[in-house]
Amino acid sequence: LLLEGFKGVKGKVESKPPKHFRTALGQMVNFLYTMQGESAGAQAFSNVDTLLAPFVRYDNLNYKQVKQAIQEFVFNMNVPTRVGFQTPFSNITMDLSVPSYYAKQNVIIGGEIMEETYGEFQTEMDMINKAFFEVMMQGDASGRVFTFPIPTYNITKDFDWNNENFSGLWEMAAKYGIPNFSNFINSDLNPEDARSMCCRLRIDNRELAYRGGGLFGSNPLTGSIGVVTINLPQIAYISKSKEEFYKLLNERMLLAKNSLEIKRKLLEKFTNNNLYPYTKFYLRDIYARFKQYWKNHFSTIGLIGMNEACLNLFNEGIGTENGKKFAVEVMDFMRAKITKFQEETGNNYNLEATPAEGTSYRLAKLDKENHTGIICSNDREYYERGAQPYYSNSTQLPVNYTDDLFEVLDHQDELQTKYTGGTTIHIFAGERISNNETMKNLVRKICTNYKLPYFTFSPTFSICPNHGYVVGEHFTCPECGEDCEVYSRIVGYIRPVQQWNKGKQAEFKTRKTYVVEEKTCKVC
């Protein structure tokens, strides 16, 4: 966008490269609105604060003007403009400080290379980030939280924990749970190697290095053509032994591969036939190099219900020693298969912890109807109270397993690092953290002591039509008795619980929230 503007389709309005801050933000909105019409998943912009900071100085904007522009951008990003009256699913990566790979690059204004380098614009970056923090915390006219864009912050080894300019980040995380944190302290990845496309698709660009060279350090142009989710509980229920389980899993993975290969061919055909005109324009350089538009996009295979697979196969969950051992074995099996698929096809494959906002409920419901006796995550509630069934997400522990956060992190650390496509640990808390220092220390402790790549802090809060933000879960306001909207993270994004599907509502009722205390968050 900064080099070429928003254009590329005959007969449609074209924009030149932006020369001003508000124009750049406006083109980002238009781009995401339009691209949501060509793909079903999320879109993301990386290095947003770094790349936009020079516009602030060139426009000679003060803080009030920057905040007004950011406010317009955020409100526009939360308008339901996609099919089904949904809001475009968007993610942005914010650097906070100028990354080394941009520091000495010349800035782009109006599509032209200027004399200054991005490393000279830290003050303007601070203005953008402060404005973004404040806008996101203030919410809309009724105090509701903004769902999009979901901001991702990279926590690196040289992260400046004592920077006072980041105080708004910790407040935003503690009050609403808005940010996603990407852990690079204990990772062998660097931020320039990875890109967060949606709430969890974390792409290892080193797989692309021999194809794209350094291009992808600054310009991702990558993603996923689609996800096929493997129903592990059903395979386990049908199987009578581990050997049969792996045989069926192998068959399902082959089916997933064939499905994704067919889809890739169809996407190439449709793109060549101008059915994805904007995608065709922005991926044209990829096509010029490989004769394929989607060459740098991954075929993604996901999984769901590892805990219930263990229950159906062994009658013990993933929280046991045997259950976790089996989960690690299955993950290694799937990783090996995906590597083989990649070698056979020449296409990129990855393994993802599928978000499964709807799949966890839909598959469990279908399995309960078609497989008598199959175990779901909330079997007791299903039989005793008629609760809607659901499966646990990917290889995660049951949501009511424990209220000890670090017990969960200890258990999940090895499993989380097995995913090559994306995964997230959500730290569900009953209410906000009142102390920003505690929030900061929690993030620091997790990143320092664990290898898990991606996590959020997700407090429950309520919105009263009269009093706005209310701490914790209150379906009626404790002050005035009005009905409240109760907010929590359904999986990747924050939504009112009342709008969740029945399966996820059943999950919310059984969730144990983690106890986060100041003493447990001290950095060791």
Describe each region flagged by the PLM:
Residues 66-70, 74, 312, 504, ...:
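Metallocofactor- and cofactor-centric catalytic cores in central/energy metabolism, strongly enriched
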Residues 460-479, 485-524:
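Intrinsic, low-complexity terminal and presequence regions
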Residues 42, 232, 295-300, 491, ...:
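Generic secondary-structure boundary/loop-capping signal
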Residues 203-205, 306, 498:
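Sequence-pattern detector for short linear motifs
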Residues 312-321, 498-506:
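Glycine-rich phosphate/pyrophosphate-binding loops
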Residues 302-305, 421, 492, 503:
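Glycine-centered flexibility sites
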Residues 1-295, 316, 320-479, 483-486:
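Conserved catalytic cores of very large enzyme subunits
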Residues 297, 303-310:
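Extended amphipathic alpha-helical segments enriched in small hydrophobics
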